[in-house]
Amino acid sequence: SERSRGLGDVYKRQISIHVDASKYSSTRGFSVYTLSERGLDREAEKVARLENSLSVFSKKGLKGVNLKKGRNLIDHHNINEAFRKARDSSFEFAEILVDKVSERSQKLTRPHRYAGFAVLKSPNYPSVLVELGFITNDNDRQNFNNRNWQSSIANKFVEAVNKNFK
């Protein structure tokens, strides 16, 4: 629809959904990951290096380089800022998601965790990686196969997304 096309960029989120496993069958519960500060800094530096190395010649000279100022147009500060905005928004969404999902599902002791997973490394939009529970736990595994549980968790995800956009 026209409305959804106009709002497309506003509503962009990446929610990567998984189930976890543990050598301990008693380990169970929901968790959500966002990019760690260390991962953020490393990723921003990689993007800056990559962007800075992609200058190519065109008819007008070296693309990506401001010949008057003698420096690359890719501003490291802007890259860092994009990562920080995405990370902050991801953090906010993760906190809301933990609150909503924990109304219907058990959560780990520290349900909001930090990692450097590839799916969390976009500076273009907020992203979270969700572990719904542990396939190695009987209770979690039963939940994964229960349509009522699936539906209630899906509804909690929708509530979290809606609350995040208010």
PLM-predicted stretches and their roles:
Residues 42, 48-80:
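Extracytoplasmic segments of membrane-associated envelope/inner-membrane machinery
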Residues 74-166:
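Active-site-adjacent mobile loop/cap segments within catalytic or ligand-binding domains
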Residues 15:
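Structured binding elements
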Residues 1-11:
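Single conserved hydrophobic/aromatic residue that forms the stacking wall/gate
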Residues 22-57:
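A short, glycine/acidic-enriched catalytic loop
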Residues 27-32, 49, 60, 106-118:
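Active-site-adjacent substrate-recognition loops and nearby beta-strands
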